[in-house]
Amino acid sequence: MPKYHLKAPYSPKGDQPTAIARLVEGVNQGQRYQTLLGATGTGKTFTIANLIAQTGRPALVLAHNKTLAAQLCNEFREFFPDNSVEYFISYYDYYQPEAYVPVSDTYIAKTSSINEEIDMLRHSATRSLFERNDVIVVASISCIYGLGIPSEYLKAAVKFKVGETLNIRSALRELVENQYSRNDIDITRGRFRVRGDVLEIGPAYEDRLVRIELFGDEVEAIRYLDPTTGEILQSLEAINIYPAKHFVTPKERLNVAVQAIRDELRGRLQFLNEQGKLLEAQRLEQRTTYDLEMLREVGYCNGVENYARHLAGRSAGTPPECLIDYFPEDWLLVVDESHVTCSQLKAMYNGDQARKKVLIEHGFRLPSAADNRPLKSEEFWSKARQTVFVSATPGDWELKQSDGHLAEQVIRPTGVLDPLVEVRPTQGQVDDLLAEIRIRAEKQERVLITTLTKRMAEDLTDYLAENDVRVRYLHSEIHSIERIEIIQDLRLGEYDVLVGVNLLREGLDLPEVSLVVILDADKEGFLRAERSLIQTIGRAARHVDGMALLYADNLTDSMSRAISETERRREIQKAYNELNGIVPRPAGKRASNSILSFLELSRRLQTDGKDADLVQITGRAVDALDSDQDAGLALDALPELIDQLETKMKEAAKNLNFEEAASLRDRIKKFRQKLIRNT
């Protein structure tokens, strides 16, 4: 059994010991589904850490967004400094999928931007799963997408061992086949160089260099080096260098795959011709024939993922292998904020297939492209042997699956009570809100404000900034790493107020926040449903003076139930504190930034020398610009305009408005060329 060393400056308190014991018993007895129902701030993460430590299982902790995943990863790294805690999220900073719009006969090629630091962390996760059994991987929903074949990835690793004979030519050939490139001048991740009897490699999964020192044909030494100073960090007896990409296809399998693709193409062309779809048949034949030539000659082509089923040797309709398949058999799944995450699992497959269907029907892809997909919900759950759902508001599906196997946490170890909830009328709400913000700012406390629409959030941010409030606006187009920075800066006091739409609910650990404001609380819908209201109110549940302000003119059923549940928990907590002589105290949790320091950010805010708030709120200025005005733009205005256009392009791609995204992409390209010509 893996040995987890849980290190914490405190021991389980309140109802944590009971919850831990119940969950551990359930896992040891083989219970497939359990639920930890814990109010915000009751230490659910610490309870799960104790569960993992006591059961000794490799664990996958699934979060519904990248920000929450980063926060959880930080916490688990603090609890388990001697064990392997990994971070696995999508490595795309920007991703516009391949698409076709039949109405306008517009084809849009796939465009993307990969974050190299996150790619390194993904490789680090799979490497740890192969080499250790004390592994906790904190992941987003991206873990249900195809990730090569674990057995081939492991088999392809290039092995070095001190004292063994090494054929250097064979080793270099294997590195190239594993998609490492030779560069004798600049060595970074995914590259290697040879200098005399020394081979240096930049592994895909870490930022240290590996030096293999030879004496003749014998491996004399293996060392880790600092990539900047060249200082020797560690000496090793043996090492495996895993492929630079997760998708590894042996030569013999590639030949079989090429033939299978050719056979499928032949059958599909016959079908299209019989249907009288001559244009589609010609298009498909031309594209696929070119791809086959590229695969045969260099082993790769643009859009190679569309042939993943053939390259992996899978049958039609079979699920792809993903991160889950890299885990050993006795792994444990923890689904954080399960009421949101489980719904996401169900939605991913349908959205992917709708887009692929159009591409296949119009001759852009073979039918097998549909098998390059995320797991279906039922496929995912069939792979999960034991699951613990974690939420303050678990969904009906999770409760049904758990079948009464439930552990509840209401008591906070700090003695902090659930926030006071106050409903105020909407008339004069902005001025009232401004007064409340100033009170908190004087006490160096933080405020979260959630609105119903993006436009409303932008307008409110504008107004607060004009009234000298230190405010930021958190929106969906912000890169995942920058999003983590924004949360970090709020905690560190760089600003006092954070405004958002649906980004301020589940799981955010912000003990400095004393006030949560919910505008339009009486507008029934997803964002103002009972569970959403309870979650949003809970963002102030880590502060001794926590308070939630709901601006509304009516008391809806959702509001009434959310307020009643908050008051019920508050009464239980108050009674426990009185019985045990507990005085509420601040959480005192420091603002950890281990993910940020680990990543060596490729960029920070794009506002060097400018007012951050102004740049954040002027995105709508892009709407006033059309292509006829582009020629007259001043050069010094182009960098900011490019940033704003990129934001709009990403929003359009996210909303499946591919024509607008492609148009914006072309304008960005034109502006960049103009900058290059004139600088």
Swiss-Prot record:
Q: Which PROSITE patterns match?
A: HELICASE_ATP_BIND_1, HELICASE_CTER, UVR
Helicase C-terminal domain boundaries = 429-591
**Residue numbers of motif Beta-hairpin?**
91-114
UniProt cross-references to SMART domains, sorted A to Z: DEXDc, HELICc
Name where it mostly resides.
cytoplasm
The record, for InterPro entries, names:
Helicase/UvrB_N, Helicase_ATP-bd, Helicase_C-like, P-loop_NTPase, UVR_dom, UVR_dom_sf, UvrB, UvrB_inter
Q: Which GO terms describe its molecular function?
A: ATP binding; ATP hydrolysis activity; DNA binding; excinuclease ABC activity
* One Pfam family in the UniProt entry: Helicase_C
UVR domain location is: 639-674
Ranges for the Helicase ATP-binding domain? 25-412
UniProt keyword terms in alphabetical order: ATP-binding, Cytoplasm, DNA damage, DNA excision, DNA repair, Excision nuclease, Nucleotide-binding, SOS response
| Record's subcellular location | Cytoplasm
Q: Where, in this chain's numbering, is ATP bound?
A: G38, A39, T40, G41, T42, G43, K44, T45
GO biological process: what's one of them?
nucleotide-excision repair
Q: Return the GO cellular component terms, semicolon-separated.
A: cytoplasm; excinuclease repair complex
Q: What does this protein do?
A: The UvrABC repair system catalyzes the recognition and processing of DNA lesions. A damage recognition complex composed of 2 UvrA and 2 UvrB subunits scans DNA for abnormalities. Upon binding of the UvrA(2)B(2) complex to a putative damaged site, the DNA wraps around one UvrB monomer. DNA wrap is dependent on ATP binding by UvrB and probably causes local melting of the DNA helix, facilitating insertion of UvrB beta-hairpin between the DNA strands. Then UvrB probes one DNA strand for the presence of a lesion.
Q: What is known of its domains?
A: The beta-hairpin motif is involved in DNA binding.
Tell me, how does this one assemble? Forms a heterotetramer with UvrA during the search for lesions. Interacts with UvrC in an incision complex.
Q: What protein family is recorded? A: Belongs to the UvrB family.
User: What name goes with this protein?
Assistant: UvrABC system protein B
Query: What are the leading ranks of the lineage?
Result: Bacteria, Bacillati, Cyanobacteriota, Cyanophyceae, Synechococcales
Q: Gene symbol? A: uvrB
